[in-house]
From Swiss-Prot:
It comes from the Bacteria. It comes from Maridesulfovibrio salexigens (strain ATCC 14822 / DSM 2638 / NCIMB 8403 / VKM B-1763). The gene is rpsG. One of its GO terms (biological process) is translation. Belongs to the universal ribosomal protein uS7 family. Part of the 30S ribosomal subunit. Contacts proteins S9 and S11. Disulfide bonds: none annotated. Keywords: Ribonucleoprotein, Ribosomal protein, RNA-binding, rRNA-binding, tRNA-binding. PANTHER family: RIBOSOMAL PROTEIN S7 (PTHR11205). One of its GO terms (cellular component) is small ribosomal subunit. SUPFAM superfamilies: Ribosomal protein S7. This is Small ribosomal subunit protein uS7. It holds the Pfam family Ribosomal_S7.
Length: 156
């Protein structure tokens, strides 16, 4: 931790097509080896497909998909005495977004379709309709927190 106070958050520029900071964050997480143009192409094509399927503005559908994947509570390990407890804690808004993006990308990469555009658009569509791997991960996280509610008094 720095001695001179908290490190300021970097300003994220909105993407050129939709003017969305969330889209920029997503493309940056999707990128491999600094190849931003490749990640942009994949993302925009996936959004185009999502817009066609949902008959809605693509960026609004994407934002709804991310909203459906955001976790509100998670568990953190806390050692008390000799035992380790899974303590439920609320998730900060910035962490909610980063977890949702991470889960969407990971589950899209593990899908069976051919090509990343098809995988990503399929995962977006599933998340938009509240199903799919990323939404299941969110529900599992919430279930874990619910099951360990008895240890909530160990919060720090």
């Amino acid at each position: 931790m720095p001695r001179k106070g908290p490190v300021p958050k970097r300003q994220i520029l909105p993407d050129p097509v939709y003017g969305s900071q969330l889209a920029t964050k997503f493309m940056n997480r999707l990128m491999y080896d600094g190849k931003k143009s490749v990640s942009e192409n994949i993302f925009y094509q996936a959004l185009e497909f999502l817009g066609d399927k949902t008959q809605e503005d693509p960026i609004k559908a994407f934002e709804k998909a991310v909203e459906n994947v955001k976790p509100h509570v998670e568990v953190k390990s806390r050692r008390v005495g000799g035992a380790t407890y899974q303590v439920p804690v609320e998730v900060r808004p910035d962490r909610q977004v980063s977890l949702a993006i991470r889960w969407l990308i990971n589950f899209a990469r593990s899908r069976g379709e051919k090509g990343m555009v098809a995988r990503l658009s399929g995962e977006f569509l599933d998340a938009y309709n509240k199903r799919g791997g990323a939404v299941k991960k969110k529900e599992d996280t919430h279930r874990m927190a619910e099951a360990n509610k008895a240890f909530a008094h160990y919060r720090w």
